[in-house]
Design a protein with these regions (language model features):
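Conserved nucleotide-sensing/catalytic segment adjacent to the nucleotide-binding pocket
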Residues: 54-118
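Short acidic, S/G/P-rich loop/turn micro-motifs used as interaction or catalytic elements
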Residues: 90-92, 127-132, 163-166
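Conserved catalytic motifs of the protein kinase core domain
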Residues: 29, 80, 154
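"Short basic amphipathic alpha-helical interaction patches in structured regions
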Residues: 87, 99-101, 136-141, 171-176
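Conserved catalytic-core segment of NTP-binding enzymes
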Residues: 142-146, 161, 167
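Inter-motif core of Ras-like GTPase G domains
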Residues: 94-130, 138-150, 156
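C-terminal non-catalytic interaction/localization modules
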Residues: 1-64, 95, 99, 150, ...
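Extended hydrophobic secondary-structure segments that form protein cores and membrane-embedded regions
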Residues: 32-33, 84-86, 119-126, 156-161, ...
Length: 319
């Protein structure tokens, strides 16, 4: 039986400049690459292709502003494509968080509505980081809100930048990530991986692709037809965000990811308000006030209109 789909409110968030998956094939193996700015997402994609296809940066200034997909043949089945999806990190150096969420959301919703299913997600963490920063925590929390715990078995939690630290330094950091930050995902089936060489990147991708194929997500069992005419398997596990936007017809601010991001920005607002009140230097105070206004504009983007709040209160999103 086909899953119920809403009217497609997410489409109202689309902009002419948005890049979405083009020339999708039913056999595509779609794998978003996620993580904080500077974690090595573009580098990972270049390892897969064994050449530079995604622009990288040597600093914490992000080179990934848009969601961009990179299709290439799967080495274990040349009739199928691996589609790696480069995503901007939250706490990006150039874009506001609400805009990043919008871009990620419309890409995923469009792919899902067109019948494409995400095979798995690779989340990258920089092992060279001496401590876990607020931006790292935010990106990890957003990963959980975007995916939902039903999808955890299809997440690979990978560490990068091993060439920048000796093993005796990196291994305790990796253990801390596993025990303190990744425990919930790992406990529900998520895998861990070290990305040191190209072979490591290929193996991580293969693990997702092989599991995707093993589960038979592209078989004719339990299929229906999407709005674009593509045959899809309704037994496939989708990202929570995709189900919220396409099946439950939520607007982006009403999703779990939208609410989480708004809460994070509001917390930053409170901290910044205190800094503005205490700052004595006129120039520094003016700069803080500009940042304050910028954060307020993001909160406004993530506000839920009254009509949508009533739908939530009265349970219209229940399936």
């Amino acid at each position: 039986m086909a899953k119920k789909k809403g009217k497609g409110k997410w489409r109202k968030a689309l902009k002419w400049s948005d890049k979405t998956l083009q020339n999708a094939q039913q056999t595509d193996i779609v794998i978003p690459i996620m993580g904080a700015t500077g974690a090595g997402k573009s580098t990972f994609i270049n390892l897969f292709f064994d050449k530079t296809v995604a622009k990288t940066s040597d600093s914490l200034n992000s080179c990934t502003a848009d969601v961009k997909d990179y299709p290439g043949p799967w080495r274990k089945d040349l009739s199928r494509r691996i589609v790696l999806v480069d995503t901007p990190g939250f706490n990006d150096s150039h874009e506001d968080e609400a805009e990043i969420l919008r871009r990620v959301s419309v890409w995923l919703a469009k792919a899902y509505d067109d019948g494409m299913r995400v095979a798995g997600v690779i989340y990258l963490s920089d092992i060279a980081q001496k401590r876990v920063y607020g931006s790292t925590r935010l990106n990890l929390t957003m990963l959980q809100k975007l995916c939902g715990d039903d999808f955890y078995p299809r997440i690979v939690m990978a560490t990068s930048h091993w060439d920048e630290v000796p093993l005796h330094v990196g291994e305790p950091r990796e253990e801390q990530l596993r025990e303190n930050f990744w425990a919930e995902i790992i406990g529900k089936g998520g895998k861990t991986w070290r990305i040191i060489t190209r072979d490591d990147a290929l193996a991580a991708i293969d693990s997702i692709a092989e599991e995707h194929r093993r589960r038979g997500l592209q078989t004719d069992s339990g299929t229906s037809t999407s709005s674009s005419g593509t045959t899809v398997n309704e037994d496939a596990i989708a990202l929570l965000l995709q189900r919220e936007l396409v099946e439950l017809d939520k607007i982006i601010p009403a999703t779990g990811a939208g609410k989480e991001l708004k809460g994070n920005i509001r917390n930053l607002l409170e901290v910044l308000k205190h800094e503005v009140a205490e700052e004595q230097d006129p120039e520094k105070k003016a700069e803080l006030q500009r940042k304050l206004q910028f954060l307020r504009s993001q909160v406004k983007q993530l506000n839920i209109p009254l009509g949508e709040r009533l739908r939530i209160i009265f349970g219209f999103y229940q399936v």
